[in-house]
Amino acid sequence: AFDKAINKQVMVDQLMLGEGQVAVGPMPKYHPYYDENLKPNTYDPEAAETMLKEAGFNFDKEYLMIVPKGNQVREQSALLIQQDLEKIGVKVKIETYDFTTLLQMLREGKADLGLLGGGSNIDPNESSVILKPNDARNYSLVKDPKWFDLANEGASKVTKEERKKCYDAYQEALVEDQPYIWLYHQNDLWAYSKRLAEVPRSE
């Protein structure tokens, strides 16, 4: 429901000036193992609110979202998430912490929501570490091993075709079950001097 309530496109358009893409799962669309058949949740706050009401969600509670200090895009993303969730009646309090403290709070379950980011690795198995039960990097504290096992099966295969089938199933399970909400994949921007020779330029 929260995934439907958050307007990710606004984050890409306003905070990144279009230099990014809305995330469906842990892999961006240009990743060689991205599943082209993924069906993302569409932004639909009315449907999100209905889902929460049907599930008996507690709208009276104020939920704590913790955010790392110093990353402007991430801090602004937190404000947009807060606004989007308040539109469907979910009260969110934002607190910022240094990165070490934030990670420890997540590991100890001292927050309802946490905002983190990471790079996109060419290894499709890289994202599964945050889904491994009892791992220190499992910040959402998920106990079900199904997602980690799906990714691990892909890592055990030899050919790209075999691995692709496993990682497609892995991504589809993540989109269906939503143990995490992936917000966006931000483009890497590089600046260089025009005095450098043999550098391909878009202009």
Predicted features along the sequence, with ranges:
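Short, solvent-exposed turn/loop segments enriched in Gly/Ser/Thr/Pro and often Arg
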Residues: 18-21, 118-119, 184-189
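Ligand/substrate-recognition segments at binding pockets and active sites
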Residues: 53-120, 160
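Short amphipathic alpha-helical coiled-coil/interface segments
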Residues: 151-155, 160-175
